[in-house]
Swiss-Prot record:
The modification S-8alpha-FAD cysteine is found at residue 308. It comes from Escherichia coli O127:H6 (strain E2348/69 / EPEC). Monomer. The keyword Oxidoreductase applies. One of its GO terms (cellular component) is cytosol. This is N-methyl-L-tryptophan oxidase.
Amino acid sequence: MKYDLIIIGSGSVGAAAGYYATRAGLNVLMTDAHMPPHQHGSHHGDTRLIRHAYGEGEKYVPLVLRAQMLWDELSRHNEDDPIFVRSGVINLGPADSAFLANVAHSAEQWQLNVEKLDAQGIMARWPEIRVPDNYIGLFETDSGFLRSELAIKTWIQLAKEAGCAQLFNCPVTAIRHDDDGVTIETADGEYQAKKAIVCAGTWVKDLLPELPVLPVRKVFAWYQADGRYSVKNKFPAFTGELPNGDQYYGFPAENDALKIGKHNGGQVIHSADERVPFAEVVSDGSEAFPFLRNVLPGIGCCLYGAACTYDNSPDEDFIIDTLPGHDNTLLITGLSGHGFKFASVLGEIAADFAQDKKSDFDLTPFRLSRFQ
């Protein structure tokens, strides 16, 4: 049997692509080395931020606005436990922060609902937060956070119900191209399709070693926090930049536990075995202390944590491009620790590719050729 589309890697982007391509009427095979959602990639840990006024660059704003529309649509499948929670996101940092300047510029260019607060305004609205006098806050009222594992589970179930074939716990070991399309090799045999999407996350280089993607071990952890830090008390999700440039992110507390992580740093790794569990690297448990001590001093001790992996590109911008020499294979990789919020729209882009539709977005900034 020859499929219209084979998806290699069915985590965040792959799960979305499987659903949108199947819904469009294509004959699709989703594959994954594990059983998604799982703990081996970049999507576990329950929650991920979604920010609209994008500090990483204005080029992402059209993508994230479309992503938000798709998240809202997906959330309607889980109204009792919504996938998107509009908690708002407060971006904290020094007034001269380049990241915050980008946030402000994105908001201005796209007329986004962002409120600027000085240090006193921040602390008056959220007494739990402490910042120096030279800090500002840019509050995105329409942003919030996503339930990442629930989203993937929902997409996979919807795709299955729509007739998508799914081959999980079965790694793809090789990809071959010929005039008839794409063939993948697995322990279960070979499968063929007209087109393929490669969104295999951190270990994409096991299949395509020439790609400029660097795996980095990262951690996040949950700390004691009472109801003052909850959504019910209107405590927001947040990003925060310390004076030394370190970047942190976090979420409102749930069940008396507040999740926080450090975006920069981490440990470069070269195999899955090197991604050791949380607390096996000495700095894991204390990584968030500089932020907690200075910005959220009322937060208690570390309860537990987890390790995940970033698939970093050299400039930490996405790679969305066809495989060189093979226009029937689309790469979506190098998401560099800020990709989950875009999973919905990237899945839609993948489905459009499989249908020979031109993308509605300017994907030029994400081409591989920028590294040549």
